[in-house]
C-alpha cells in the first residue's frame, strides 16, 4: 500500500481509529502521513506522495542504477527521477530511459533536463491534474515555498481528481448536490437524496413564475413576444 493511498484511507476513518493507526505506525510513516494531512483538501499537497526517487547531480549513471535497485522497489513510481541538491532544492529531472541510453560513467548533471515544470503544495489540485494531462506527464514534482522538493503527484492520482471534478460538474448540470462518489457508483437512494433539494427549489421557482404569469396573462396574449422573456 503506497503512502498516498494510505492517506486516502485514513481521511475516511473516524478520528479515534486514525489515532490508533498512527500510534501503531513507524515514526517515519507517521511523520509522512501527518505531513500530507496538514494540507488543504483541494491542494496539490493533499494528493501528493512523498515516495519519490531523488538523485544528486554529481552521481554517475552507474551510481543512479545502484540507488534504483536499492530503494526502487519500495516506491510508487521510478519512471521519473528528480535531481536535488543537499537541501532538496529541485535542480532537474530525467527518466529511466535517459539513464539506459547514457554511458555508465556519465554524470547525472550532464543528462538531466534543468527545465522542470513543477507545482507548489498549495496549488489547486485540479490545476495540477490538468497540467499533468496537458504535458502528458507520468508525475509532477511538488515543491514548497522555498522550491524544495517535498513530493510528487502521479498520473493515477491526477486522473482521480479529474474524474471527481467531472462528476461534480455533471451533478451540478443535473441539479444534484455534489457527491464524493463517481456518478455510476452512486446508489439510487443517494442520487434521489442529492437531487431532491434542487428539485424542490425548481418546483418553488416554477410555482412563483406561474403565479406571476397569471397576473400578466392579458399582456402576454396581446404581445406574444413577451413570452420569450419568461424564465
For the regions a protein language model found, what residue spans apply to each?
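Cytosolic regulatory modules rich in charged/polar residues
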Residues: 1-231
Amino acid at each position: 500500500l503506497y503512502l498516498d493511498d494510505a492517506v486516502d484511507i485514513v481521511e475516511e476513518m473516524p478520528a479515534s481509529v486514525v489515532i490508533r493507526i498512527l500510534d501503531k505506525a513507524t515514526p517515519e510513516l507517521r511523520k509522512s502521513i501527518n505531513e500530507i494531512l496538514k494540507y488543504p483538501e483541494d491542494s496539490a499537497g493533499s494528493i501528493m506522495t512523498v515516495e519519490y526517487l531523488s538523485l544528486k547531480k554529481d552521481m554517475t549513471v552507474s551510481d543512479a542504477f545502484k540507488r534504483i535497485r536499492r530503494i526502487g522497489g519500495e516506491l510508487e513510481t521510478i519512471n521519473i527521477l528528480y535531481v536535488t541538491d543537499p537541501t532538496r532544492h529541485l535542480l532537474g529531472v530525467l527518466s529511466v530511459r535517459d539513464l539506459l541510453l547514457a554511458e555508465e560513467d556519465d554524470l547525472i548533471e550532464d543528462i538531466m533536463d534543468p527545465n522542470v515544470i513543477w507545482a507548489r503544495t498549495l496549488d489547486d489540485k485540479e490545476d495540477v491534474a490538468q497540467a499533468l494531462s496537458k504535458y502528458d506527464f507520468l508525475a509532477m514534482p511538488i515543491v514548497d515555498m522555498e522550491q524544495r522538493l517535498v513530493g510528487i503527484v502521479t498520473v493515477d492520482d491526477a486522473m482521480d481528481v479529474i474524474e471527481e471534478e467531472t462528476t461534480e460538474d455533471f451533478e451540478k448540470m443535473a441539479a444534484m448536490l455534489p457527491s464524493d462518489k463517481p456518478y455510476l457508483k452512486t446508489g439510487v437512494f443517494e442520487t434521489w437524496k442529492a437531487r431532491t433539494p434542487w428539485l424542490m427549489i425548481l418546483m418553488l421557482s416554477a410555482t412563483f413564475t406561474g403565479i406571476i404569469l397569471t397576473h400578466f396573462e392579458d399582456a402576454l396574449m396581446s404581445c406574444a413576444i413577451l413570452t420569450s422573456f419568461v424564465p
